[in-house]
Design a protein with these regions (language model features):
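Central regulatory/effector-binding core of bacterial HTH transcription factors
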Residues: 1-52, 199
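Ligand-binding "clamshell"
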Residues: 48-53, 144-154
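Flexible hinge/capping segments at coil-to-helix
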Residues: 50-88
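Beta->alpha turn/N-cap motifs
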Residues: 27, 43-46, 65-67, 136-139
Length: 200
């Protein structure tokens, strides 16, 4: 998420110079109170009912690979071809390894990764280095696709699946003014992003 936030911070700091910002990056869900965190950004379905959440938008997910990987291993022409390729996936939860391809039983194709990582950003770097085929959000990979560093695959079979992006904070905590203006700012800026979708 830092690659999304970083370009926005100069404008936010110019508008609100009195607000001090401390950023943290974590691959796992954190306790916001224990970590003294006002707001967190989360992608995907929320599990914690103790959270207030503001939906900032949605982002599509796609199957991607680097040109170098495809040059060496070939380009899959169908979902069935993926069985012959090195797939990159998440350690947990397993739902993140359900790719937006039909499984023939009315659901999504669940893959068995050859390489697993806990972080989408780690998987992105593995894919960029030619280590295999990955499924990630447009939020994370839009610039890679635009530059040609990652190539979309199986677009003709891809289900139009997207993930929600939320700003979350604890339900029992009074929303601080600084948090409110930051969330409002994020909502305005995210809506301008090229990967943004208002609805799933």
């Amino acid at each position: 998420m830092l690659h999304v936030l970083s370009p926005l911070l100069a404008d936010f700091c110019a508008q609100y110079p009195q607000i001090e910002i401390e950023l943290g990056s974590n691959d796992h869900l954190i306790d916001l109170i224990e970590e003294r965190t006002d707001v967190a950004l989360r992608i995907g379905r929320l599990q914690d009912s103790a959270m207030h959440a503001r939906l900032l938008g949605h982002t599509a997910i796609r199957i991607l690979a680097a040109p170098a990987y495809l040059a060496q291993h070939g380009t899959p022409q169908s979902a069935a071809d993926l069985a012959q390729h090195r797939l990159l996936g998440f350690t947990a939860p397993t739902t993140l390894n359900q790719w937006p391809l039909p499984d023939g039983r009315g659901g999504l194709l669940e893959i068995s990764p050859a390489v697993r990582a806990s972080s989408g950003e780690t998987l992105r770097h593995l894919a960029l280095a030619g280590n295999g085929i990955v499924c990630l959000s447009d939020l994370m990979t839009f610039t890679d696709r635009e530059s040609g560093a990652l190539v979309p695959l199986l677009e003709h079979e891809r289900e139009h699946v997207s993930q929600p992006l939320y700003a979350v904070y604890y339900r029992h905590r009074t929303l601080l003014a600084r948090t409110a203006v930051f969330i409002d700012f994020l909502a305005q800026q995210v809506a301008k992003m090229p990967w943004y979708r208002a609805q799933a």
